[in-house]
Amino acid sequence: MSIEKEKFWASHKQVVKEIGGTNLINGKHDLFKAVAYTSDDIEAVESQFGVPIMGLQFHPEMSMYSNAFTCSEKGRDKKIYLSFQQSVWSFHNKQVLLAEFKNSKHYSKTQHPTEDITEKLINYENNKYNNNIIDIFNETSVEIIGYSNVEILN
């Protein structure tokens, strides 16, 4: 989510001075990125990978000015909360789907789901394309997002 540079009301002094202990196992990237600062503190962080995580240490719903509830500020505030709501629903749906998968008869902790599937060759008119997906695609009239006769260039 992108919010233009703006002044927010931050009335608390319990703030993060630095981000630490968030490296991924491979040590190449930090999980969190600081996205809002004051002159001496980090005020907000966002996760860069995996589940969306946002940490706010200010009041995004309140401006530091008396005209805190202008239309543009209300729109900005709504975007923040809608983004949060969308993240909550996405995480919930992922958990439901994962539970359904784990409880299905096709899931096995000891066997990969595709181990018992044998590979089958594609037969198109006596296999004139030699199972080459690029040849099959180029010889077939297709429609992708409103474009017809799309070609893959080698």
Swiss-Prot record:
Keywords: Glutamine amidotransferase, Transferase. Residues 1-94 form the Glutamine amidotransferase type-1 domain. One of its GO terms (molecular function) is transferase activity. InterPro entries: Class_I_gatase-like. It comes from the Bacteria. The keyword Transferase applies. PROSITE patterns: GATASE_TYPE_1. The keyword Lipid metabolism does not apply. This is Putative glutamine amidotransferase-like protein RP712. It comes from Rickettsia prowazekii (strain Madrid E).
